[in-house]
Amino acid sequence: MLQRIYLDNNATTRIDPKVKEIMDPFLRDHYGNPSSLHQFGTETHPAIAEALDKLYKGINARDIDDVIITSCATESNNWVLKGVYFDECLKKGKNHIVTTVTEHPAVRSTCNFLESLGVEVTYLPINEHGSITAEQVKEAITEKTALVSVMWANNETGLIFPIEEIGAICKEKGVLFHTDAVQAIGKIPVDVLKANVDFLSFSAHKFHGPKGIGGLYIRSGVGLTPLFHGGEHMNGRRSGTLNVPYIVGMGEAMKLAVEHLDYEKEVVGKLRDKLEEALLKIPDVMVVGDRIHRVPNTTLISVRGIEGEAMLWDLNRSNIAASTGSACASEDLEANPVMVAIGASKELAHTAIRLSLSRFNTEAEIDKTIEVFSQAATRLRNISSSY
């Protein structure tokens, strides 16, 4: 079988073998419903508690009860935005939300929905580096602002937003602060207390855990109307039978993610830089966004004169997986929203290719990718009508 190279780790990651190993007994032997009073149910409780302990410590929350299990970050994001709508907009008359133009569709689409209900949403523009400033947030906040929602790291460029500065402003103004940390956890340190975060969303499958499980950090003392109603699971905050094997897997994945942070910075970051520097030697290739303030695994490359989709499928034929942007929107074949937001032409914005590494990538894989990418760029430009 030909070697396959996976460089789409911002879309999803492979499960770490250690995560699979710790999940297996709960898929096979310890399958009881945790809410049941018999031993099949109660024997799962220690493992759930241990997993929650790993999760809250992984983001430096104060208490184990500050982390609520969800199905994914999309659910977590929806819960925060819609919960704030009920708690702040309807009950207190605060009908304003501040976010950015480059948020994940799970946030943007939910904000669009809330706008249809009469909520005013300010979408902060990004600068030429792909970022915003804390001052922009400060200027956007009004007496009617209920929530500020800004992602910790961008899913396409990897750029890190000034979360600590924004958190300090929100705390000073008495405004709730939410961050989608899906692309930050496992790549850089995430500290909810230091950042003054009220809500933080994450998904296990982005840091080598299973798909279909995620979480929401809710700062102690902050209320949030439940998105789901039913049983009294998670202290009545999120109904639904607890998915024990996936919770156990997510806890272990978080623990391993924190343990590998130095490796991400020193090894994965150097592999990304090697890949990037080699691709920049190809004529008319550029890196999109700030190359300094970003997570260590991600690069967004623009290859002038070549449609991103054409490059994507050429790489795919050589068994290399990459992306043109968010996996939740990439099938639409739209211009890259980050490139559009920084002012690139739609023609140029269609040339984006995202390459995102993980701790399981090797230097040999990067060398092979450089070779294949360079050959593909030459071949595709030879048949391009726009280069």
UniProtKB/Swiss-Prot annotation:
Primary role: Master enzyme that delivers sulfur to a number of partners involved in Fe-S cluster assembly, tRNA modification or cofactor biosynthesis. Catalyzes the removal of elemental sulfur atoms from cysteine to produce alanine. Functions as a sulfur delivery protein for Fe-S cluster synthesis onto IscU, an Fe-S scaffold assembly protein, as well as other S acceptor proteins.
Family: Belongs to the class-V pyridoxal-phosphate-dependent aminotransferase family. NifS/IscS subfamily.
Record lineage: Bacteria, Pseudomonadati, Campylobacterota, Epsilonproteobacteria, Campylobacterales
Subcellular locations according to the entry: Cytoplasm
Pathway membership: Cofactor biosynthesis; iron-sulfur cluster biosynthesis
Reaction(s) this enzyme catalyzes, per UniProt: (sulfur carrier)-H + L-cysteine = (sulfur carrier)-SH + L-alanine
Keyword Iron-sulfur (UniProt): yes
Primary location: cytoplasm
Record's protein name: Cysteine desulfurase IscS
Known cofactor(s): pyridoxal 5'-phosphate
PTM sites of type N6-(pyridoxal phosphate)lysine: 206
Keyword RNA-binding tagged: no
Organism: Helicobacter pylori (strain Shi470)
Residues where [2Fe-2S] cluster binds: 328
GO cellular component: L-cysteine desulfurase complex
Alphabetical UniProt keywords: 2Fe-2S, Cytoplasm, Iron, Iron-sulfur, Metal-binding, Pyridoxal phosphate, Transferase
Residues at the catalytic site: 328
